[in-house]
Amino acid sequence: MGRLMSPFLLLDEMGPVVYAPGEAIGAPSHPHRGFETVTYLLDGGMKHADSAGNSGDLNPGDVQWMTAGRGVIHSELPQDHMMENGGRMHGFQIWVNLPAKDKMMLPRYQDIPSSDIPETTSDDGLVWAKVVAGKAFDVEAVIDTVIPITMIHLKMKAGATYTHACVHDLSLIHI
């Protein structure tokens, strides 16, 4: 994506894939530095552990927001039930570049369960929104971002419309 999509460095769609027992794969310990990883899971189950002592489970609808800053080593692996039983895995991971002044900040980890992520619907009931980061429909997310980011999971019924006001210099990814 490069300079044209700054601050976004990468967008990875994980799946959708259905794993048989014992087949699910993840990412064993590996380093990151100078950016944030935002993982949003739709199906399946993952577990996180890192060199800063953070750990957490990621279930459908949950968000993991890891700020690597000056550097962190972490792993993202299937939860035990995914390895034992198999199942459907689907989610997204976005890498967000940190501004130069923040690249050496201390690493941090935010694990936000689906139940803590605000949801709302449009007045006509045709648009459902989960406000992961930023603001939509006058609902503000609970996540603390280093740079202003808006991430909204939308479900729209037939005939629905939604307009989101954006500042003129915003980079946008629509999935």
How does the language model describe each region?
Residues 39-60, 75:
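A short beta-strand-loop-beta hairpin characteristic of the jelly-roll/cupin
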Residues 61, 69, 157-159:
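Tight coil/turn sites that cap or link beta-strands
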Residues 68-101:
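Ligand-binding loop in jelly-roll beta-barrel domains
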Residues 1-42, 120-163:
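A short glycine-rich, His/Asp/Glu-containing loop-to-beta-strand
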Residues 93-129:
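Long amphipathic alpha-helical segments that form oligomerization/scaffold cores
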Residues 173-175:
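Conserved small/polar residues in nucleotide/adenosyl-binding loops
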